[in-house]
């Protein structure tokens, strides 16, 4: 028996591959693959799937595997047949990692074991991605043993549905894409200056008024507008449907209600929540706006708490994202109520941050306490570090990596999502035909990021919980452009999230991702092809 790490050269040397052979060169890269002696497993119509558990989640894993096999090969397994070879899904409490799995491939059986149904699901995904994408009567799986587990417990992707609204069929397809890449968190950005996308029963004007903008700027801040009303929002039933669809694929949906800034959608509906009283309108162009929630108005806190009460009733996630980014405090500086609140609380500028920054920290901490009373914790963008932060807060480090480092120093957990590596609204290649937010982010750069260097301080290693890619949608309209911006960079991020850093290799990734690109094409995902081109 020869132990190998899954790399292109070693796998090709160890396991002979033919058109209808399974290929264990998958994305993300498993921690280890061992080529075993013995005859291969031959998948054919007489193969059966045995779920060694009465657990509903395990049964669903079996159904997914059957669907994936038919999807890739055209082979429809006979559930009633008991005479052929078997793929067995089973739980194994001896596996250490909650999301880890072991696949053992022998002549008569393929066994996928996990400590939890979630781990088994990731094993199913690996088997799925090893399948050849062609119609076949049989597929040969070389004898092998795969032992795998994730590097990070948080592996996320954010979709901004506030600047541009995406319909339910796309949301589900997006979730399917996450599942394919072993991503376990869907961060759903739902409110913005340009539109409020969440049904809240207590405040119907949020969707009656706040979800609609009269028009949208054309191009990159041209001053020209399309004169076309734009809107859309998700009902509670639709959001619950998304939560269920994601949960079936072991993905947690974390909603974001951004505050106190990026709130013109809400202020247009309820102007009394702003410092000036309005009138306000839903933003028709992109950027940051000075009007934010009034932190000196008790009705603001009542509004926020009531909204979040309805949010936690829809979303069972441990975390609720409450934003905290890009909140200009100029209105607070001149607002009598905000200044009175600063005086009442005895807030003063310190450590380079103003009294108004301390007021924002107070605001965020009040929201955190309310959510903690509901059994939840908050996530916020790294601006929330501009003041004293509630100890249960998790920080998303987006303005580079320093936010994550500072959070760790304060004993706070952090998720690394720096713009220079993980902002997928950036260009992937020079292209004058496309209008995007700007900057260049090729897949090589995304792949090369290491959120926790080997020589990192122990505090950093302890508190960095994972990574996340973000798709902001100022210039992303529709399914095709969304997938073009997402892939293959989501795959690059996913490998960083899953695979130990010392096992990553970009040349290997390119080969493996080129195979996965065939599956993207099968789904009709029009992805950026720059990675797959032969370099001259």
Language-model features and meaning:
Residues 96-302, 306-319, 366, 370, ...:
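Feature activates predominantly on carbohydrate-active enzymes
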Residues 266-272, 281-394, 398-409:
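Active-site neighborhood of glycoside hydrolase catalytic domains
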Residues 377-393, 398-536:
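Flexible, acidic glycine-rich loops studded with aromatic residues
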Residues 20-154, 481, 497-528, 532:
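Contiguous, structured surface segment used for ligand recognition
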Residues 57-58, 165-167, 193-199, 260-266, ...:
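Flexible loop/turn segments at secondary-structure boundaries
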Residues 1-25:
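Bacterial Sec-dependent N-terminal signal peptides
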